[in-house]
Amino acid sequence: MGPLHHAVAGPAGGRPVLLSPGLGGAAGYFAPQMAALTARFRVVTYDHRGTGRSPGRLAPDHDVPAMARDARAVLDAAGIERADVVGHALGGLIALQMALDAPDRVGRVVVINGWDALDPATRRCFAARRAILAGGGPEAFVRAQAIFLYPAAWLSAQAERVEADEAQALAHFPGAETVLTRIAALEGFAIADRLGAIGHETLVMAARDDVLVPYTRSERLAAALPNARLALAPEGGHAHSVTRPEAFNRALLDFLDRD
């Protein structure tokens, strides 16, 4: 398998931070964080295998451990031995897997709307998204995505922006087979019995109105990790790093800047 597309930004002497996006897989998800992070950190972004600028057919059994190996390969390509890892949803699962598989490569961990085992509510959402993709194709899947990501009031206020984002997502849709394989990887991730082995400083972030991943799942994750703290936003949805970037960035920087 070929190398993944990645980019490095920020001061050469800054502490490295790897950003790993969610199901969509595109590095651009973290655009609202880049200015704040690159002012002081050496930030590595990348597109997951099979998405964005990292094309390629996924093996049917492509899973989170394979994605964690990809993330380590990105660090290798960037010449970075150890980095803090910030991951949204699937990216957060990758961060946890990296901490388990290669603990010396990982500094601090940030898990945004993630989990240690799939929640029944999340399973229901994924079943609905698979049905939308099967019945309506890529356009229906992409248009429905915003309902799972954003609060209704924000979605209403940002309708033009969302439509532009949807056009971009549809133009770069990775294909149904890739999307379904990545959803299966999310559904198969289960490390509840291994959380005690993750001693890294960890920030678990969530929004109370996330309809895709209940915030209670983040509460349980933070409670089970030996060295974790929880940051709950009152609102913002599954993509609260996008809908409430100022508050999100403050909480993120407060954690990453700790001595």
Swiss-Prot record:
Known Pfam families for this protein? Abhydrolase_1
Domain (AB hydrolase-1) spans: 16-118
EC class, as a word, reads hydrolase
Show which residues constitute the signal peptide.
Answer: none
Q: Which InterPro entries match?
A: AB_hydrolase_1, AB_hydrolase_fold, AB_hydrolase_sf, Epox_hydrolase-like, Pyrimidine_utilisation_RutD
One GO biological process from the UniProt record? acylglycerol catabolic process
- Give one GO term, molecular function aspect: monoacylglycerol lipase activity
| Function noted in UniProt | Involved in pyrimidine catabolism. May facilitate the hydrolysis of carbamate, a reaction that can also occur spontaneously.
Q: Provide the protein name.
A: Putative carbamate hydrolase RutD
Q: Which organism is it from?
A: Methylobacterium radiotolerans (strain ATCC 27329 / DSM 1819 / JCM 2831 / NBRC 15690 / NCIMB 10815 / 0-1)
Query: What gene is it encoded by?
Result: rutD
